[in-house]
Amino acid sequence: MEWADCLAFQNKGHTTIIIYEDNRMQESQVPALKLLQEACLRFGSSLQGRIDSFCHLTGSRQKACIYVNPAALFIPNQSMKAEDTWFLNYHRILN
C-alpha cells in the first residue's frame, strides 16, 4: 500500500477498499486493522502503541487518530472495529 498517496480506505470485514489521491481504487484481501498494524510496525510502533499515545496526548479515548508516518494520519469516521469504517488521511484531505 502506498501510504503517502492514500486518500482513504474502508474496512469491509476481511477486505479493505483503498482510494488513492489520483482516484485509483484497490481492493486488498487484508483487513484494514491488519494493514494499519503492519504500517505502524514498519514505522516504529504497534497500532496499539499509536492508539495509546493518542489517548495519552489528547485525553480522548474515542475515535483515536492513527499516526503512521509524516504523510499519513488516519482519522476513523466511527469505531475502528466497525465493519464499514472509513479511515480518512488528514494530510490528503487538508491539501
PLM regions: where:
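Eukaryotic intrinsically disordered, low-complexity regulatory linkers and tails enriched in Ser/Thr/Pro
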Residues: 1-87, 92-95
